[in-house]
């Protein structure tokens, strides 16, 4: 029998590691999600992918697009479950207005960073981000490799 993958944070549901590789994260925000019952059950089972998702700011509202929440097999069959439906983010008006201003003026974008539980509610961490160029990605990878090598050297020579 295969062992379950151990999570670092028990409150964490899903992480978008690709976002931190593709973007410089300038600032992070936390928002609630408007979910249906079957989606919460699926999240408890960890059946979610946010790697291909993005956030759209439209009509003074924030929406999560492309997040795949797979319905459970035991979910109700008499209702239609759309795994890719758009989900509304629950944020304060001033936060949304600030994000909209920065996205319009300075070329920022808003990306989902992760899903987690907070007091029994699902929260999404979103980041105000600026895209990385190819040479920036290479520099990040080089720095990550050097830190890994440094740790190995310290482990064996200390």
Curated annotation (Swiss-Prot):
One of its GO terms (molecular function) is RNA binding. Coiled coil: none annotated. Disulfide bonds: none annotated. GO terms for cellular component: cytosol. One of its GO terms (biological process) is trans-translation. Keywords: Cytoplasm, RNA-binding. It is found in: Cytoplasm. The keyword RNA-binding applies. CDD domains: SmpB. NCBIfam families: PRK05422.1, smpB. This is SsrA-binding protein. It comes from Hydrogenovibrio crunogenus (strain DSM 25203 / XCL-2). The lineage of its organism: Bacteria, Pseudomonadati, Pseudomonadota, Gammaproteobacteria, Thiotrichales.
């Amino acid at each position: 029998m295969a062992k379950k993958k151990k999570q670092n944070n028990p409150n964490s549901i899903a992480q978008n590691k690709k976002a931190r590789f593709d973007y410089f994260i300038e600032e992070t925000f936390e928002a609630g999600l408007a979910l249906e019952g079957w989606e919460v059950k699926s999240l408890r089972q960890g059946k979610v992918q946010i790697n291909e998702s993005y956030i759209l700011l439209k009509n003074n509202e924030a929406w999560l697009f492309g997040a795949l929440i797979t319905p459970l097999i035991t979910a109700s069959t008499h209702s239609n479950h759309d795994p890719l439906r758009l989900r509304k983010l629950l944020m304060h008006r001033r936060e949304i207005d600030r994000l909209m201003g920065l996205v319009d003026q300075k070329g920022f974008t808003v990306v989902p960073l992760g899903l987690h539980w907070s007091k029994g509610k699902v929260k999404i961490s979103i980041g105000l981000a600026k895209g990385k160029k190819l040479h920036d990605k290479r520099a990040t990878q080089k720095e990550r490799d050097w830190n890994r090598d440094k740790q190995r050297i310290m482990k064996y020579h200390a």
